[in-house]
Amino acid sequence: MPGDLELAAVAALRRALPDARVHRGSPDWLMRPGRVECGPRWDLVQSVYRALAQRDLCETMPPRERRQVDAVIEREGEPPRIFEFDESQHFNAHRAVTLRLYPDDVETAFPLETWLSESETSTKKLGRTGGWGKAKPPLFPEPGGRHVQRAFRDALADLLPAVHGWAPTLRVADFEVQGWIHSPQGGALMGNLLEGRLK
């Protein structure tokens, strides 16, 4: 279930983009992306998975590999766009591994260097048991697999939109909004934050 901050961020996004349809859901190509869905970025996705898991990615994703993005943004005359609200668990050493592998031609709708810096300097302890750190077979069966799975899924959401004619995934971090996300000015401040990210 979405957390309080995520719900507030999506609500502020709707106020910031009154002409857009902002809704829950995930594009079909992101549900279980294998070789076909990754298209020309299959080798890149393979290299990301290999760096995280030290083995090759199967060409067809297992049926249990499903996911939900935080929101999809649709505006008339523009390609659709994924919105993701990244809380502290999205910034860690595994995410840094993925971000370092992005080639220069990967367009992002978030400050890549900020995301990399936050991931490299995160002091968040990565538990290897319990809900946050449990194994996530079949792709990430080791203890702590949930953390690695999250980093891989974030990378897929960044790398695959261009393959399918979608705009770059828009990311907003909790540390960018915590001081004002629940305020009456949240929508306007979200709009200010997004200037330059929505091109």
Model-derived regions, located:
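Conserved aromatic-histidine-acidic binding/catalytic patches
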Residues: M1, E59, P63, G145-Q149
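Nuclease catalytic cores
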Residues: M1-R21, R150
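Conserved glycosyltransferase catalytic-site signature
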Residues: E6-L7, R66, D154-A155
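Active-site metal-binding core of divalent-cation-utilizing nuclease and nuclease-like domains
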Residues: A20-F85
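Short aromatic-enriched loop/helix-cap "lid" or pocket-rim segments at secondary-structure transitions
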Residues: R35-V36, H94-T98, S183-P184
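Short low-complexity, flexible loop/linker segments enriched in glycine and/or proline
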Residues: E37-G39, P184-N192
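Catalytic cores of nucleic-acid endonucleases
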Residues: S88-G179
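Acidic, His- and aromatic-enriched active-site or binding-groove loops in soluble protein domains
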Residues: N192-K199
